[in-house]
């Protein structure tokens, strides 16, 4: 009977876990994974135990890479995979459990600083780039040789940007090359002036110049991807780039270009809709999407204070990687806010999979902080550290007696007038939400209780005295997929 709706119960016990196999030939492992640089990193530190972190798509090469590194360094290598959160973040907790003295991160990385001090080396990969095709595509997209343009790329193509700029500089006068914001070695020389760090990249701007003056040419992506909105790195750039500047992308294999202006407008419209949903929300779920990135506890406290100031109830949920099945267990929550790294916040979310919107911390800030600039003037910040005190983008909450809290606000989704929030500090004895009524009754104002009262099913009821007393009988045996009394039909 169970085969009609699902696979037999024995299939889970007989299933064999497949292996991804060796994806890269042995002759190319040294070049693709920069083994010579990794060996120098391990020898300079004198580490005896090193953790090697691989994403799922590169686990097929993990065994061969670890064997080559052990042979070259004499150190013990530990392979880390299946991270609790995003694979782009450094798995500091996994490295500590293995007793590793250093960590080497392979594959795409958000380059967020870890929460605990640990020597880390990043190997972003070296994807082949058709320089001649990309140069022709750049010339077709940028006919004006005097227009300022910055070269961007996905992390695995960053090694080819300087060579591409060499082909273009004889004609283009104002060309800027970005580079990944890798951590600088201890004791290294800091250039003066220091380059601007944004979007996980460094921009060597000349004195008096700003990044908002430049257009962008992005090298990365693949034509095999049917939905380009699933690239979190490119989405981060499109959301944070100046709206009035041109932005185009180029496939490194074929040189095919695409104007990203329409896609950028669609992403911004989606984010503005999420901000409106957050303003209408009464209950906010704060998802702990990382435990290994620096200042995540401070950011969590900041978001809780933000929701309290806006008159909303917040709950902190630690669920690992968020999935629709996990979040469906909390129907009382109106919106969720994912506190994660920039790439984790913009991770692929198939349309319609989550029954409640999942927001970024920046969108909750725009919804709850009345001092935040209006849309079009405020930058879209993809890293939660940009919202904290000490950042140039930090906007403090206005005082409780500020007129900004009493400004009329109308929902663009429902058309209703939103009431101003009731600000009460956490140490106020009158913040227990118990309000005396003229009829000498007490009413408790709770969004969760209001939601429970509106539900048709409120859980199992004891029904004391309403059912006859009977003896205990034997219940059904088996599992839900196949009980013993259902037979084999």
Curated annotation (Swiss-Prot):
BP GO annotations: protein histidyl modification to diphthamide
Binding residue positions for [4Fe-4S] cluster: 89, 110, 341
For this protein, the record's InterPro entries field holds:
DHP2, DPH1/DPH2, DPH1/DPH2_1, DPH1/DPH2_3
Q: Which residues carry this modification: Phosphothreonine?
A: 435, 467
| One GO location term (cellular component) | 2-(3-amino-3-carboxypropyl)histidine synthase complex
Record function comment: Required for the first step of diphthamide biosynthesis, a post-translational modification of histidine which occurs in elongation factor 2. DPH1 and DPH2 transfer a 3-amino-3-carboxypropyl (ACP) group from S-adenosyl-L-methionine (SAM) to a histidine residue, the reaction is assisted by a reduction system comprising DPH3 and a NADH-dependent reductase. Facilitates the reduction of the catalytic iron-sulfur cluster found in the DPH1 subunit.
The name of this protein is: 2-(3-amino-3-carboxypropyl)histidine synthase subunit 2
Q: Which organism is it from?
A: Bos taurus
